[in-house]
């Protein structure tokens, strides 16, 4: 019986001398609801916890209370400079972590979805700021193309060319532009407008259009229908 008690006592002493396991940080679940994701502070708390966790002091094993005085004094002398260095690192880390937090408070917090959508070309570009342009009265006048004021001589020559042929070729257009001092686009537009005026005033339709109209396949004419009201 005495031997068993001694064996149990030795086992208890051995178990008491073992160092306690380090305390692990509690796992925190993030709520991935839409309302939480759209908040500007989504993910900020997790980053702060990581910074403090990285800069924190790891738990060291406690020295055995039953050890002699020499070992305890030696461990205290060794742990004191280490703890002082670690405390300095913690202070430096806290000062560094506090400085970006102040800068982030000055800046506007944008939600995370702004950096992951089609509104930004690059994930780090952030939301775009569009500058409003000042409206000038001169812009409206510049957009409109000024009408060409033809002289009497230019009009006579253009009408003569139009009587010979309603469709002008490129060579004739270049020759008229050099002779009359006009651009080729001005001459081309004048011929197009002249043909449109004649077609609109005469109302002439070609044989193919008349045939299609007879079959009910082509009819661009508009007619007004008046409904008779019953008295």
From Swiss-Prot:
Residues 143-202 bind DNA. InterPro entries: Engrailed_Homeobox_TFs, HD, HD_engrailed, HD_metazoa, Homeobox-engrailed_C-terminal, Homeobox-engrailed_CS, Homeobox_CS, Homeodomain-like_sf. This is Homeobox protein engrailed-1a. Keywords: Developmental protein, DNA-binding, Homeobox, Nucleus. Residues 68-102 have a biased composition (Low complexity). Transmembrane segments: none annotated. Residues 43-56 have a biased composition (Basic and acidic residues). One of its GO terms (molecular function) is DNA-binding transcription factor activity, RNA polymerase II-specific. The gene is eng1a. It comes from Danio rerio (Zebrafish). SUPFAM superfamilies: Homeodomain-like. Belongs to the engrailed homeobox family. Residues 1-29, 43-105, 121-148 are annotated as: Disordered. One of its GO terms (biological process) is axonogenesis involved in innervation. It is found in: Nucleus. The lineage of its organism: Eukaryota, Metazoa, Chordata, Craniata, Vertebrata.
């Amino acid at each position: 019986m005495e031997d068993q008690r001694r064996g149990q006592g030795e086992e208890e002493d051995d178990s008491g001398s073992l160092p306690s396991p380090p305390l692990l940080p509690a796992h925190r679940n993030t709520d991935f609801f839409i309302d939480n994701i759209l908040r500007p502070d989504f993910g900020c708390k997790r980053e702060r916890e990581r910074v403090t966790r990285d800069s924190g002091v790891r738990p060291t094993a406690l020295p055995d209370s039953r050890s002699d005085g020499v070992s305890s004094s030696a461990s205290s002398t060794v742990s004191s400079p280490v703890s002082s260095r670690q405390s300095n690192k913690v202070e430096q880390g806290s000062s560094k972590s506090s400085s970006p937090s102040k800068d982030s408070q000055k800046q506007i917090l944008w939600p995370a979805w702004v950096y992951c959508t089609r509104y930004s070309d690059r994930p780090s570009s952030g939301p775009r700021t569009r500058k409003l342009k000042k409206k000038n009265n001169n812009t409206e006048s510049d957009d409109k193309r000024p009408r060409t004021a033809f002289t009497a001589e230019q009009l006579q020559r253009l009408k003569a060319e139009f009587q010979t042929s309603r469709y002008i070729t490129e060579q004739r257009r270049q020759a008229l532009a050099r002779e009359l001092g006009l651009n080729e686009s001005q001459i081309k537009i004048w011929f197009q407008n002249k043909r449109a005026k004649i077609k609109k005033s005469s109302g002439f339709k070609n044989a193919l259009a008349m045939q299609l109209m007879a079959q009910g396949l082509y009819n661009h004419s508009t007619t007004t229908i008046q409904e008779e009201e019953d008295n």
